[in-house]
A protein has these predicted regions:
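Structural signature of tandem alpha-helical TPR/SEL1-like repeats
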Residues: 76-87, 109-122, 144-159, 166-169, ...
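TPR alpha-solenoid repeat register
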Residues: 99, 133, 167-170, 204, ...
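Residue-level recognition of tetratricopeptide repeat
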Residues: 62, 96, 130, 164-167, ...
């Protein structure tokens, strides 16, 4: 699964980025993204002035100077010294609202979110018209996880603000809070409102892209991300988000370009190499996919997901030892992921380690007892060991969990037929075909063989014809048809079908079936 969760907190413009990974890439599964960019605009749109508060009272004037000094220290990131001065100002002038506001901002910067909330609320209690405190309260409540409270605070700020105030940051933050509440329509409206106030506000365009994507409006989301990038070409988060949407739009080349831009801007940007590897993999560019996943591992060596997808790529690349090692490492890092043990089982079976494969599948099933894919794969390896009763039970369990598992029906049918149970095999193949899967010509051929076993030659012939209509170059269907014509006494047709099968087997250099087909032709030529 593509990594999509983005968490970003921006102080002033774009400052601190933290991207959290979500999900994993299963061997069999769908893309389930969850992009959530969080980039709070944290400087109040309303200028915080204390010079207007100058009074004839020496004590008050002294407190105001303390606040001014504290503000300067806070801007220099000398937070502890700033806190001391804000508290001195409050002690001297308990009604000095800017001191409480500055205290709240500084406490939030120090990570004391509840302290910040209390300070902003105290400022509002003293002066309900002091708009910066509502803005600061909204930020602190959002960071605490109280999105509803943040929405109320931002709305109060907007209502109390003067007409000439640039409300773009407030509407942007309001959009983030609505998005977190899953109120996507209001989030879209808020981000659009932010853009109305400031058409060049890159964060707002990026936020708009995020919620449009969640609405399923991918084309507009891509346009919004591109606009954010146009306004802020160095904005790595927007490039990353664009890459995700392009990937989902199956524009893998475009996604690669976007992710590569991220690596240029921020080489240590979390998950970018993982997602870049996925895009290469979709283009079947396995060398670049493998190299990129290795880069992702260098960046995050304890990420089991990366080892799992790397194992999958190695498996498809027929590099079985590397696949087994990657899946094994994935299961060591995180032994609670069923799909990783399933992948390990696939690799071990290909290495001939059947007992190891069985153990891996059993661990997969222990983690997820409803994992139909693992039961199907367990059935295959049990069948390899001629433990046919257990294999049949495993295939039936896969089907019981997932009645649409065409592969399990197909495997069950082949095993039942090999056990002489052609009637049940016919039923299994028919269900496979009804559900549908890749390479159905194989299943039509198997169905034809099962019909022939039962003497239902007309139905067998139709099944072979259907197989060849789907894949005219499937040698086993031609061979099966040759055997059928032989049973019907149609020698010339039989020879013709066998000769077509022989040509295809020779192209594939299948020595065993070349010999069998030659023997069948020779036997018929002796009849003519």
């Amino acid at each position: 699964m593509i990594k999509t969760a983005i968490t970003k907190i921006a102080i002033t413009n774009i400052a601190i980025t933290n991207i959290a990974a979500v999900g994993l890439f299963p061997l069999i599964g769908s893309l389930t993204p969850a992009l959530e960019p969080i980039a709070l605009a944290q400087t109040s749109p309303t200028p915080v002035r204390v010079d207007r508060l100058i009074s004839q009272n020496d004590s008050a004037n002294s407190s105001i100077k303390l606040v001014e000094q504290a503000n300067s220290l806070r801007e220099q990131n000398q937070l502890d010294r700033a806190l001391t001065l804000y508290r001195q100002a409050i002690a001297a002038s308990p009604e000095l609202v800017p001191a409480y506001y500055g205290l709240g901002v500084t406490l939030r910067q120090k990570g004391d979110i509840q302290g910040a909330i209390n300070a902003h609320r105290q400022a509002i209690t003293i002066d309900k018209s002091y708009t910066p405190a509502y803005y600061g309260l909204g930020i602190a409540l959002y960071q605490k996880g109280d999105s509803s409270g943040a929405i109320d605070a931002y709305q109060q700020f907007i209502q109390l603000s003067k007409a000439d105030t640039n409300l773009a940051p407030a509407y942007y933050n309001l959009g983030l809070a609505y998005e977190r509440r899953n109120n996507i329509d209001e989030a879209v409206a808020s981000f659009r409102k932010a853009i109305e106030f400031d058409p060049k506000y890159a964060l707002a365009h990026n936020g708009l892209g995020t919620v449009l994507r969640r609405q399923g409006n991918r084309k507009e989301a891509i346009a919004a991300y591109r606009k954010a990038i146009e306004l802020a070409p160095q904005y790595a988060v927007a490039h990353f988000a664009l890459g995700i949407s392009l990937y989902e739009d199956r524009d893998y080349t475009g996604a690669i370009e976007a992710y590569k831009r991220v690596t240029t801007l921020e080489p240590n940007f979390p998950n970018v190499y993982y997602n870049l590897g996925l895009a290469y993999n979709q283009l079947s560019d396995r060398p670049n996919a493998i190299a990129t996943f290795r880069k992702a591992i260098e960046q995050d060596p304890r990420n089991a997901d990366i080892y799992a997808i790397l194992g999958s790529v190695f498996l498809r690349d027929e590099n079985i030892p590397e696949a087994a090692e990657a899946f094994k490492r994935s299961t060591e890092i995180n032994p609670k992921v069923a799909s990783s043990f399933n992948g390990l089982g696939l690799a071990l079976r290909r290495q001939g380690d059947l007992e190891g494969a069985i153990s891996a599948y059993q661990k997969s099933i222990a983690i997820n007892p409803n994992y139909a894919v693992a039961y199907n794969n367990l059935g295959r390896v049990l069948s390899d060991q001629n433990r046919n009763t257990e294999a049949i039970a495993a295939f039936r369990r896969a089907i019981a969990i997932d009645a649409q598992n065409a592969v399990a029906y197909s495997n069950l049918g082949n095993l039942l037929r090999s056990q002489g149970n052609s009637d049940e095999a016919i039923d299994a193949f028919q269900k496979t075909i009804a559900i549908g899967k890749e390479d159905l010509w194989v299943d039509y051929t198997s169905l034809g063989l099962a019909y022939a076993d039962r003497g239902r030659l007309g139905e067998a012939q139709n099944a072979y014809f259907k197989a060849l209509s789907l894949n005219p170059n499937f040698a086993k269907a031609h061979f099966g048809l040759g055997a059928l014509y032989t049973l019907k006494g149609e020698v010339s047709n039989a020879i013709r079908s066998y000769q077509e099968a022989l040509k295809l087997y020779e192209e594939n250099r299948d020595a065993e079936w070349i010999k069998r087909t030659q023997q069948a032709i020779q036997a018929l030529q002796g009849i003519t």
